[in-house]
Amino acid sequence: MKRNPEFLLRDVAGTLVVVPVGSAVREFSGMMMLNATGAYLWELLENEQTIESLTAALVERYEIGAEEAQADVSAFLEKLKPTGAVIL
């Protein structure tokens, strides 16, 4: 999976948000706020990733357990999937 190029990460008054651009605006006209972990995952999704590779990246960066990292990745992806921001 990877991020949809028609969604961009922006800093709006100190808050990180993912916003649709181009034709994606017709499908999703809102924005999604991300914390630092979500922004890190978003950056990783510039390239093709798997749940396992994203989980491993969180374990390494934040020194957390694999179960916690996988739960964070799953929650992040469940938030993004309905918007079309992630291409599976």
Tell where the protein language model's regions lie, with residue ranges.
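Acidic, low-complexity/disordered tracts enriched in E/D and polar residues
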Residues: 1-39, 43-46
